[in-house]
Amino acid sequence: MKPMLKDFSNLLLVVLCDYVLGEAEYLLLREPGHVALSNDTVYVDFQYFDGANGTLRNVSVLLLEANTNQTVTTKYLLTNQSQGTLKFECFYFKEAGDYWFTMTPEATDNSTPFPWWEKSAFLKVEWPVFHVDLNRSAKAAEGTFQVGLFTSQPLCPFPVDKPNIVVDVIFTNSLPEARRNSRQPLEIRTSKRTELAQGQWVEFGCAPVGPEAYVTVVLKLLGRDSVITSTGPIGLAQKFGYKLVMVPELTCESGVEVMVLPPPCTFVQGVVTVFKEAPRSPGKRTIHLAENSLPLGERRTIFNCTLFDMGKNKYCFDFGISSRSHFSAKEKECMLIQRNIETWGLWQPWSQCSATCGDGVRERRRVCLTSFPSRPGCPGMSLEASLCSLEECAAFQPSSPSPLQPQGPVKSNNIVTVTGISLCLFIIIATVLITLWRRFGRPAKCSTPARHNSIHSPSFRKNSDEENICELSEQRGSFSDGGDGPTGSPGDTGIPLTYRRSGPVPPEDDASGSESFQSNAQKIIPPLFSYRLAQQQLKEMKKKGLTETTKVYHVSQSPLTDTAIDAAPSAPLDLESPEEAAANKFRIKSPFPEQPAVSAGERPPSRLDLSVTQASCAISPSQTLIRKSQARHVGSRGGPSERSHARNAHFRRTASFHEARQARPFRERSMSTLTPRQAPAYSTRTRTCEQAEDRFRPQSRGAHLFPEKLEHFQEASGTGGPLNPLPKSYTLGQPLRKPDLGDRQAGLVAGIERTEPHRARRGPSPSHKSVSRKQSSPTSPKDSYQRVSPLSPSQCRKDKCQSFPTHPEFAFYDNTSFGLTEAEQRMLDLPGYFGSNEEDETTSTLSVEKLVI
């Protein structure tokens, strides 16, 4: 009975269920939950019941977002389908939240309304799970790190409008627990946009928040405020920690470098400690060998090799941050360090010098410190030696030789020393030999005859007529002395020197002798000696009662060549009475006396005789010295036959000319003053010169005067007066005699008359006016001299022009052309021309005409 009752109960239940289910309407979800952004699809089952009258209805299912009540999508059911399953794709669920599925029927015929009914279902959507990770970037030293985003949920492949996510990173300098008692923490936010991916790394830069940094990562959907996931804050020091970078094994030479790699966005600040890892008993503390502190921002430190033992040992290094941190980060790294000692120790003190005196050697040593004594490898020398110099040894005590001193440099030094000394001696000997050869190897150039009757002037200088200087050189192309006088035909022997024809002059043989003579004579004769001599003679004439005299000087560019020349030649006197000798003592003699006649049986005087005659003293103190060339070449030149005529023995050089210099014209000067102190010297010199003239006058030889030349001479000497007839001493074969005083005065009248037109034209000079008052009678005898025309250097070099007689044979010579030119007449006083003192009262003005006292 019981089993039959049980079966009936089951049948009844089935019938009841069929009735209920057949008439019910519903909307059911297969899965109550869903994951947003995932690739899962949402399935919804539905069923609805048709009415009894069989009216058709339209049924739709809506997907609504519960928070905003917005419709996401709508799906319609078929009219003939009362039950089934609807599929909603994954791309409808982009965001986590609550969703509603609602089924709503719609009537097709509005005439028959029916009551509204509605079925719904609830769906909860969640975010997928993303794992956030932090990592060091490859550019950790530049302050960057990486954020990793990973999920295990398969993501929906959005065909269109794929959503993007935003990663926010927040940097802080403290933990939330520490913010209660401190100020507002520093917070720096940075964001990056990225695509939706199942796994990816996003790189971020560090923010300067301080030595400690904390990071919070937030993942959001772009355009939405909902947060997909959030991680943090994460301490970067705890996350990454500090790392000690070193090699596992090294050989220590100078030091061991340890580098600390800090966490990203964190500055290093701590202490690096080194200790030796060795087995120790339990409870024994590790001994630290050294500690190096790292300042803020520094990453490297070096430990010296002297801290480590020799050989190979294991040492460990650890790094600890400052105690202010909320956590204690310890990083430990160990490594094997091999230390091989191969270095020099300290130098030992210097040893004593090897010698007690002189040069010695001292040395010092050092030891190589190495781990392998069998094969030391220290570079360099273990022994060093140096020279030591002590007190010098005595001459008999030789210095001890140095055993370690190299011999090569010493020998080379000795060779250099000997060579230098030899070279110096050679130079000294050569200098001495050259000096001796130049002093004694050359012949004497000048032979100066001494004069015993020379009287010095009060100024302690020798006068120009006190000494004859012989210059051994040939005559220059100018007026010459003695044997180098102007040449002419043999028939010109009887003509006075002032009337002879000029001729060619032999070339100069030795110019150096003339220059040497002039330079030596400058040291003996004062430049203006001739002018002072004229003043002395003038004073002597005043004392002796002489009233008038005239002197003509040839003034050249050099004071050595100033020469006084009488204005007109006078015949020599036969003899001198004592009165005449006393009068002639202060009378200026002509430097051009006529040449004595030579007898027919005798030859003309040779050059040697003429030179000997020239070597005598000068007649006038104002005359120049004798050239050395006359004595040097007198033996090599021929006699008068080689020249065109014989030269006067008393002919003296009157001027020296040079082409490059401008000639100074000759001026006629008066002898203004004569100091009383020089009068005795002058008289003594006059007597000495007369004695020398007589001594050197040739006795056995004379000059021949031919008859025709004697006639010319008589015509040239004048037309009337005492000088017209030839004196008896001028006959052939008779020696010449001195002209007396009367003949000389009478022969000079013509010279006085020729000077009068010039005086009348220019007027008397001041000296003439003052002197003319003292004249006792106009007919008193006067010593007058004829003026000699001045010559330019070029004329004297080319022609040696001189006056010639008025004989028809000499008619082509114009005697008037040898007078003074206008330029010479316009010349002012000679002392001003030579730069003398015009304010001297004893100096008279020099003029070009005869002056009368």
Curated annotation (Swiss-Prot):
Parts of the chain that traverse the membrane: 415-435
Polar residues bias spans: 671-686, 767-795
Subcellular location: Endosome membrane; Cell junction, Focal adhesion
Topology relative to the membrane: Single-pass type I membrane protein
GO biological process, one term: focal adhesion assembly
Phosphoserine carried by residues: 464
Example of a GO cellular component annotation carried by this entry: endosome
Organism of origin: Pongo abelii
UniProt key word Glycoprotein: yes
Compositional bias ranges of the Basic and acidic residues kind: 687-697
Protein name: Thrombospondin type-1 domain-containing protein 1
InterPro entries: THSD1, THSD1_D2, THSD1_D3, THSD1_N, TSP1_rpt, TSP1_rpt_sf
A molecular-function term among this protein's GO annotations: extracellular matrix binding
